[in-house]
């Protein structure tokens, strides 16, 4: 399935990782404008990498394990206006973060983790890898972020709301802490079903108990139209906004 944005195009080449609203929200929300070195963990077909390239002047490194997704990511990067700033690593993030050149190197890390923690897996293996947390659970993901993130860097993620408690439990075992939490409601009259998270490293001069900023983002009003919040967030990407 293919999707065209204002400045780039994404074709998932049937890899099982098409453009999602979650990805667009995360890519538009993450504070990337000043980042010089950006890491996209589990890049899929390259959506977050290309959004990051559009929103910054930084160098983008995308890591994707699944072969078909990596091929789609490479294709989309090559076709984009920022091919010279985008690099794909086809491999496991846990291996990548062991390499000395990437340790404490990135000043921003973005990730839209797999989101089905329980229940039946998808029939096709590549789609299952895209959607199920068996491939990269929260603990190894957070360890990779901690290893690759610079001392003053940040990491941005989006999760289903039901995963937040378990994610926070894993987070408390790391040298990372929660800076911002934005609960995302798909419609004004519904409960939040997603959460945007901004993480940072705990420095020697600060405490893990520093207060986290809590806000909300509503995507659509009761009439089904995008809210002013959503329009302001995504207007640089969606063609019809």
Curated annotation (Swiss-Prot):
It comes from the Bacteria. GO terms for molecular function: nucleic acid binding; tRNA (adenine-N6)-methyltransferase activity. GO terms for biological process: methylation; tRNA processing. GO terms for cellular component: cytoplasm. Coiled coil: none annotated. It catalyses: adenosine(37) in tRNA1(Val) + S-adenosyl-L-methionine = N(6)-methyladenosine(37) in tRNA1(Val) + S-adenosyl-L-homocysteine + H(+). Pfam families: MTS (PF05175). CDD domains: AdoMet_MTases (cd02440). Disulfide bonds: none annotated. Keywords: Cytoplasm, Methyltransferase, S-adenosyl-L-methionine, Transferase, tRNA processing. It is found in: Cytoplasm. PANTHER family: TRNA1(VAL) (ADENINE(37)-N6)-METHYLTRANSFERASE. Specifically methylates the adenine in position 37 of tRNA(1)(Val) (anticodon cmo5UAC). This is tRNA1(Val) (adenine(37)-N6)-methyltransferase. The lineage of its organism: Bacteria, Pseudomonadati, Pseudomonadota, Gammaproteobacteria, Alteromonadales.
């Amino acid at each position: 399935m293919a999707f065209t944005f204002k400045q780039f195009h994404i074709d998932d080449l049937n890899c099982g990782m098409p453009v999602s609203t979650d990805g667009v929200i995360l890519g538009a929300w993450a504070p990337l404008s000043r980042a010089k070195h950006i890491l996209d963990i589990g890049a899929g077909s390259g959506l977050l990498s290309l959004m990051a390239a559009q929103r910054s002047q930084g160098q983008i490194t995308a890591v994707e394990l699944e072969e078909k997704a990596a091929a789609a990511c490479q294709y989309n990067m090559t076709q984009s206006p920022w091919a010279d700033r985008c690099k794909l690593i086809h491999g496991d993030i846990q291996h990548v973060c062991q390499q000395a050149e990437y340790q404490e190197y990135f000043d921003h890390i973005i990730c839209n983790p797999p989101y089905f923690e329980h229940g039946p897996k998808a029939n096709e293996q590549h789609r299952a890898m895209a959607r199920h947390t068996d491939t990269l659970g929260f603990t190894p993901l957070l360890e990779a972020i901690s290893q690759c993130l610079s001392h003053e860097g940040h990491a941005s993620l989006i999760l289903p709301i039901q995963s937040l408690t378990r994610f926070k439990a894993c987070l408390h075992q790391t040298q990372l802490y929660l800076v911002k939490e934005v609960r995302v409601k798909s419609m004004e009259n519904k409960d939040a079903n997603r959460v945007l998270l901004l993480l940072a490293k705990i420095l020697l001069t600060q405490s893990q108990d520093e207060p986290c900023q809590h806000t909300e983002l509503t995507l659509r009003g009761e009439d089904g139209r995008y809210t002013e919040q959503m329009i302001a967030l995504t207007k640089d990407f969606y063609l019809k906004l």
